[in-house]
Amino acid sequence: MFGKLNHLAITSDHYTLLGMFYRAMFGLKASGDTAREIGAISVGDGYVGMTLIPRRGGRKAGLDHFGIEVEDLDKVRSKLAKKYPDIEIVKRPGNRPFASYSAHDPAGNYFDLSQPGHENRAEVYAKGEWKQETTFSHFAIRAREAERLADFYTDLFELEARNLPSEEGGYHLTDGRMTMAIVPWKISSFNGAGIEQPGMDHIGFRVPDIKAFEANRDRIAKTNIQLAPKPIPFDAEGAARLALLQKCPHGTVQLADPDGTLIDVAQDHS
């Protein structure tokens, strides 16, 4: 596969808390580089890295963007210039542990681009791959023109489309290990709940034993209330939002991190 879906990013006022949450809840590993973690913390599963970014003034909190590692960045630049001339690709500051460049899709969702061997790569992105039982499974984007975005990502990064039951008009693209779900954004989807802008929707994990995961989740919440998942269905609006999340075919248990980022979890049956 030409493109690897192996980077996620969350912006937060509590990035150090989230670092502990994802390590405790899902067994993700951090680099342990304190000098770099003053600026941001990256955690990973041996394939996907997720950078937790301190929120600056004017920047929104929450699930922020994703990234794609490519074999040949020049090939991507050439294809963008030829087929999508209105889409920009820009060089990023050298202190990013993953991103060498960033671009955007036709809907304006921005994503980072990286290539093995680039000098800026650091932390979990420079450690090489390792194996662990709990891993990322997918992330989801809500978009007005889901089909157009699916065509864009399959064309540019040679991702494989999967035929899965989903929300009507949804698409699921995979690099063989991680899946990008592109689901339609409709204002009516949020009936009974707070309306959210199009953009990134949630992240997902696969675990070896869903019952053991739930027991560990409850143990963590009792041990340290600050690491407890934020409740989703605490009222009628929350229940409506949970019902929307549950339409995703990749998960069976849903929760939110302490900041409210939605998470979908399923047992690995491979």
Each PLM stretch: what is its role?
Residues 47-51, 60, 108-111, 177-181, ...:
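Short, charged/polar, Gly/Pro-enriched secondary-structure boundary elements
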Residues 53-55, 124-128, 188-193:
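Short beta-strand/turn micro-motifs at beta-sheet edges
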Residues 4-13, 41-44, 55-132, 164, 172, 218-270, ...:
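Vicinal oxygen chelate
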Residues 147-233, 238-251, 258:
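Structured core of small recognition/catalytic domains
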Residues 54-59, 117-119, 184-189, 269-270:
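A short, sequence-level motif marking secondary-structure junctions
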Residues 1-49, 95, 99, 140-187, ...:
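Core segments of cupin and vicinal oxygen chelate
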